[in-house]
Amino acid sequence: MTITANGNPAYFTKVEEVVKAAPKLQDWKFTTFVQPQHAYEELENGLDKPYVFQDITLKTSELKFMPFKYNCEKKIDMIVYLKNFTLYSHNKNLLQLIYFMMQDLLGEKSLYENINFVELGQLPDEEKNELICMYDLQYYLDHLNSQPL
């Protein structure tokens, strides 16, 4: 059973307390927060399953990002680039889907401890070297968090 704070940092401590106090039950495992769901190798090779939501179909392996601000709380602001942003930009659920995909990639706690703001944009026709594959986001965050401010 996963106990979640639904991304609300105000409840992170409570979630940890509940799981710590949970009774030991046969065949039950209590887990704090939504955990990462992807195998890195599948993402790197483009073998991940697409997320399909209403008229949107996206694969994490096809997303790129560019951080543009890093604050003193060790949180980044970033732009997530999509191949078909112009096609999907009218959909009010697009940003929510991107956050859901990032939660599957990073896990609930890491997402809300490390990401401050997400903007969406069209992936350029000529891919720039400074864009980072979305599946490398956790590695990028780990590197940032290992550096002194």
Where are these regions (language model features)?
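Short hydrophobic/aromatic beta-strand micro-patches
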Residues: 2-6
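Long, contiguous binding/interaction regions
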Residues: 7-149
